[in-house]
């Protein structure tokens, strides 16, 4: 009789959890919540913004992120944003003025014509493998139609990766 009571209690507990609307926190990992105040009430709205907490700065990591979200990860800032924070390229001080950030999102002109051109296509670049000090030669260059190339010799040669 005691065993039947324990089993019944366990089923009741499981049913209560299942029907209470309990959803693990992880289910909302890619849909952050924002709080919006209205006149006398506060409401919670789901937003489609995705914010990355980790630093993503490898060729494959950034390429995969670009394909999935159609933008650079949050650890990237443009040269003008970095300058506004006090970055001076000749000082190699990006890690000091913007810890955890890398330069990315600026237009790449493709002046030498080493990348394929097409009507309306624009190119942008992103530093890869940056940790601190002066920027290295590794860059990811991506187009407005999502062609993605890498260069490890500061634009001398390119290899398509996506």
From Swiss-Prot:
Its EC number is 3.1.27.-. InterPro entries: Barnase (IPR001887), N1-like (IPR000026), Ribonuclease/ribotoxin (IPR016191). GO terms for cellular component: extracellular region. Its main location: secreted. Keywords: Endonuclease, Hydrolase, Nuclease, Secreted, Signal. The keyword Transport does not apply. It comes from Bacillus intermedius. It is an enzyme of class 3 (hydrolase). Residues 30-53 form a propeptide. One of its GO terms (molecular function) is RNA endonuclease activity. The keyword 4Fe-4S does not apply. Belongs to the ribonuclease N1/T1 family. Pfam families: Ribonuclease. This is a purine-specific ribonuclease. It is found in: Secreted. Residues 1-29 form the signal peptide. This is Ribonuclease. The active site is at residues 125, 154.
